[in-house]
Amino acid sequence: MAERAAIAIAAHPDDIEFTMAGTLLRLREAGWKIHCLNVSSGDCGSLVHGRAALRRIRAAEARRAAAVLGAVHHPSLADDIGILYGLPLLRRLAAVIREVRPAIVLTHPPQDYMEDHTETCRLAVSAAFVRGIPNFASVPRRPAWGGETVIYHAMPHGLHDPLRRRVVAGAWVDTTAVHARKLEALACHESQHAWLRASQGMNSYLRDMERMSRAVGRQSGRFRHAEGWRRHSHPGFSATDADPLRAALGPLCRVNATYERALRRGAP
């Protein structure tokens, strides 16, 4: 059986480590090949370094973090605050999807506290959608791939959407046993310590990740540390009930039965 692949597509170097890395580690333990792609270079995230220097620093940090996770690192495709939904970026991201052929795509939620996250989500969904369309040319050109792929959206920052509404996951992955490795990967992004404190009020980005991990764990009602996910609608991507994350992780992935019942009832 061919090795199955999963890719995390995030806006900035360190976003994957905040909300997705634990799930990647669990998939790797289950025998999957894992990939990391930060769409932007993160070259605006400093009060000290210029853009060119910061671009190099953050690329090196992202490579080190991917190595800690045991993931394939993919180079960034744009600069910071430059993630705009459009054909140039979509064609490049589609090429990555066609190369990786992921059964699982992890990405940001459709609504988050900053537009780079929202635009990255839109691009990831569209790149997955066009993966099997031969007449859509990727850059560089890659053959269309018609395999199934399922998209999972991570939890928004602070577990609230931009309108301050609380967001509850549709499923939780137990990351307790891999939490130390997740922290180690996030700690690779040393350049962000002072920046996140000054720009976003994070006293310590490591402690902030710890708090969110525990909060999602409490939301699960079962796990000490967890990452939460909402599964994207299936048309254009997979069979109706395809859920490869749950299939791969078994009891480490707890489905939110209340969330699923609400979907069946048509509740918001």
Describe the residue ranges of each PLM region.
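Metal-dependent de-N-acetylase/amidase catalytic core
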Residues: 1-9, 85-268
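Active-site rim/loop-helix segments in enzyme catalytic domains that contact anionic ligands
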Residues: 1-100, 130, 242-248, 259-265
